[in-house]
């Protein structure tokens, strides 16, 4: 279990690093172009998800999702079990991480979740009201989802899932 947990932590920290890099270095470079066309590469959640998607080319059994109750991009909408993780963080505001196990069609998986809480007022420039959002974002995703977020609200969870089957097999041999 410890080995699987370390793999999950490495994936989570990698996604967090990509998000941070995107906010500090990519988004400022493309702010002018963003006025003419929506550039998803400037969105931290998109950058982290794309990074993990590339990692999945060689490790398809690993996953990362920015699971959101009211996402801008429908691909980020929570499944039932992911919503339980988000509500856990909403009900336990001080908690920073949850670790659990679940059975999937491919075998047991360990998951690690961390809350996505809106702490940066800049997020509300796109996610408060559709009328305040950049038109390029509305043109891409529409005006029905990803709005109404509030400062200090937990709107989702970063969730990493890692298979337990390989380390379990190694431990048994």
What are these regions (language model features)?
Residues 1-118, 122, 133-173:
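Extracytoplasmic c-type cytochrome modules immediately beyond a signal peptide or single-pass transmembrane anchor
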Residues 125:
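Short, cysteine/histidine-rich loop/knuckle motifs that typically chelate Zn2+
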Residues 128-131:
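Short functional micro-motifs and their immediate structural scaffolds
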